[in-house]
């Protein structure tokens, strides 16, 4: 049996401490973890895909088994091209579960070989979202406890 490979998809606009917590914990379980940065067509991004990928690379540099790539199309198809047997999703609250369960069921229908793993976020991040970070920063609120330092600097620069 080869490496245990997983994909953790997301918009990561920007990456938060909650995202990083899930990535670090998944990196302990899987031999290779692809962080796939997606463009969400229903959201207007603050950062380009390239900017998001660079921030993620910087904040995951201490995790040698993490690779950062951009992806488009179906996550389950992307996972298959990477030889992944798992998709990792973070759950903040019960409210996330129903939506994530629907996606997991659809992915299972599309490719039964790829499992979905849910990791519960650390309770101190259960309220945290990229949207919330952007909203607080837009009004000059302090986001230093919500995102890694390099991300804080980049977000602040966008709202100057």
Curated annotation (Swiss-Prot):
InterPro entries, alphabetized: Cyt_trans-like (IPR004821), PPAT (IPR001980), Rossmann-like_a/b/a_fold (IPR014729)
Residues carrying the site annotation Transition state stabilizer: 19
Keyword terms, alphabetized: ATP-binding, Coenzyme A biosynthesis, Cytoplasm, Magnesium, Nucleotide-binding, Nucleotidyltransferase, Transferase
Pfam families: CTP_transf_like (PF01467)
Cofactor(s) of this protein: Mg(2+)
Disulfide bonds: none
Compartmental location: Cytoplasm
UniProt-recorded Gene Ontology molecular function terms: ATP binding; pantetheine-phosphate adenylyltransferase activity
Enzyme class: transferase
E.C. number(s) listed in UniProt: 2.7.7.3
Keyword Magnesium: yes
Residue numbers binding ATP: 11-12, 19, 90-92, 100, 125-131
GO BP, sorted A to Z: coenzyme A biosynthetic process
GO CC field: cytoplasm
Positions with a binding annotation for substrate: 11, 43, 75, 89
Entry similarity comment: Belongs to the bacterial CoaD family.
Subunit annotation: Homohexamer.
Stated role: Reversibly transfers an adenylyl group from ATP to 4'-phosphopantetheine, yielding dephospho-CoA (dPCoA) and pyrophosphate.
Name of the protein in question: Phosphopantetheine adenylyltransferase
Species for this entry: Listeria monocytogenes serotype 4b (strain CLIP80459)
Lineage: Bacteria, Bacillati, Bacillota, Bacilli, Bacillales
